[in-house]
Amino acid sequence: MSTSAVCALLVAAPLVLPTAAVAETAGAPLELEAKIPLGAVSGRIDHLAVDLKRQQFFVAELGNDSLGVVNLAAHRTRSTLPGLKEPQGIGYEPSTDVVYVANAGDGSVRLLWAEDLTSKRRIELGADADNVRIDNARNRVLVGYGKGALAVIDPKSGAKVADIPLKAHPESFQIDESTGRAFVNVPDAGEITVVDLAKGEAIGTFPTKGHRANFPMALDSEAQRLLVVFRSPPRLLVLSSQDGAVIADVDTCGDADDVFVDPKRHRVYVSCGAGVVDVFEERAGSYQRIDRIPTVSSARTSLFVPDLDRLFVAVRASPGEPAGIWVFRPAP
């Protein structure tokens, strides 16, 4: 099938920011560099994934039932693929050059060739396929789904080879390739589950200290710390990834859906549906919020790409603001 048959091409040009918009974040730890329009995209936007080889990233346009492809070098939308069912999680697997798109609406995982988004395979998980992670060390793709499991997919065959059972539906999870463990947010069970990937089973839990709705998660592998953001109350909890000991517990913005570590600057970025990105700085084991960067209400998903040294925030369409990706440059 040709590219034109599956992709509706867009001509959205990069938006030149007015001086006032640039000045609003000038001197801040995150400076707004560009706004990339996504075209006629309505509703909620979920997660993002990057393809560094082609300098492009993929956008799960959940409310639009589509997948967007953005050219990072040109700061413009390249194409969009319609016909999905509430896409949530995305992962790019470089060894096979395949994009994995997890759909909440029908529980499927669509495997698409990254070059032109033509279909390679479809895996039926049954319900609520969600976050996607690439396990490079074990050459596997993991997808959280249903009432409580991580599906394990072999990228060479494109087939599901195992399930790792959990107590309830998994939200964000991270893989520690150095230890062969995964840490999984399971909010309906009120816990963070520790998984042994070689055994394919849960081996323990970390405390949540009475906090609820743990959705975003990041792993600071170098410092051996796990960063988890809760929505009720809105808190950033920092744990030792070795034993779950609490290192920090600080207030953050509401309705968070993504958190990232900037190892170069010892910072943490939390994107929130409250319409802000919280910026924390780590100093001698303590975490202090140094700024709160305004975005747009419901702009709660984001992607920090260390190789590009940029934070990309997904902004859904609203009165006065079209759907787009806001590009922030960390400073200094």
Question: Language model features by range: what are they?
Answer:
Residues M1:
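Zn2+-dependent metallopeptidase catalytic domains
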Residues S4-P18:
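Bacterial N-terminal signal peptides
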Residues P18-P332:
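Predominantly soluble domains enriched in secretory-pathway, periplasmic, or organellar proteins
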